[in-house]
Amino acid sequence: MSLMTKLGLRTLVASCLIAVGGAANAQLNVLVTGVGSTQFPIATANFANEANSPQQVSTIVRQDLQRSGKFTNIDAGATPVSETDSVDLGSWKAKGANAFVSGSVNRLPNGQYEVRFKLYDTVKGESLGGLVLVSPESGLRMSAHKVADYIYAKLMGGRGVFATRLSYVIKTGGRYQLQISDSDGQDAHIALSSPEPIISPAWSPDGTKVAYVSFEKKKPIVYIHDLPTGRRIVVSDQKGNNSAPAWSPDGRTLAVALSRTGNTQIFAVNADGSGLRRLTQGSSIDTEPCFSPDGQSIYFTSDRGGQPQIYKMSAQGENAGAAQRVTFTGSYNTSPRVSPDGKQLAYISRVGGGFKLYIQDLQGNTATGLTDTTHDESPSFAANGQYILYATQVNGRGVLAAVSTDGRTRQVLSVQGGSVREPSWGPFMQ
């Protein structure tokens, strides 16, 4: 299979999606299929007064912690416990919980909702603090995710990604929909609906914009979509293909793959569509650019060696130095994505007759397969670098999946009766 044949699936896959029935903004269903090697036992009580709120905050917190694969939920019973209530930490420790969470949800006079909670270490017998979160009714789920992020940070020592968002493409009723959801696939809404395919969504570093390729004018054009306002601008509408947008870490520049000169090459363009400049100079096909976290390098896919492999060049282009090959395990590797700390590379490798998600240590160059599926594509790191979101197939139907970088924890996110593709995991929210 040629490079353009395989990568052409990124352009054509949207037209092959199965129509999704039901609500236009269908929610993703999450199935956790694995857990971490060790799990932290925690009890999260029902929050006081949440029975009268539109969202059961404590339930969302428990679900977040469970799907991370790093926690096991100890039954806290049905009795609500407020953050102001006295807590017998010794009794919770005796029940097997090393941490305990209590809280409350209250509707304020202005119609907003206030979530308060407190986290306890039952082993040391001390409080680990808490937060007060105020939001409109529509923000209650996000408040719950922020509670889970706080717990994750205090007990795991790193940032959680429950309060981040996902983007992906669904086809329903003959229209293509770019949808934005919470990290658990809930609270989904449509950012763009079109009768033509939408592919390759990419989040801006500040999480307020998504770049993507739309075929609404019967050809691929790169747009930037401002999510709060819905305003769009054209970034690249060159002759031929305009594809694979990737943001620089400072949000000022995008790398794109264009065929305006013949074979597809990598270009850079300012985020307002000005200042187009060519970065790769050869006669090969160069595509799928991805910036390193420090913005100094660009990883990309090229067939310059005969078969598709992943290369690295200066963000200033090949005029600043020849690109260096990065992948050597396997004869066919595409779709590079660099971890937020710059230490790992996720990519898709052809294994036998299928395509599997791999991760490579960029210091030791050791490559490891993470999945047992054979139709993997479009990897995207979580903002904390602990998980990778990707598209694949289960029982012949397109789904999204997430796997921890150690391969132990796996989640499948699907839409009832249909297929979903083109995932991108958003950054930490500002």
Curated annotation (Swiss-Prot):
GO terms for cellular component: periplasmic space. It is found in: Periplasm. Pfam families: PD40, TolB_N. GO terms for biological process: cell division; protein import. The Tol-Pal system is composed of five core proteins: the inner membrane proteins TolA, TolQ and TolR, the periplasmic protein TolB and the outer membrane protein Pal. They form a network linking the inner and outer membranes and the peptidoglycan layer. NCBIfam families: propeller_TolB. Belongs to the TolB family. This is Tol-Pal system protein TolB. It comes from Paraburkholderia xenovorans (strain LB400). The lineage of its organism: Bacteria, Pseudomonadati, Pseudomonadota, Betaproteobacteria, Burkholderiales. The gene is tolB.
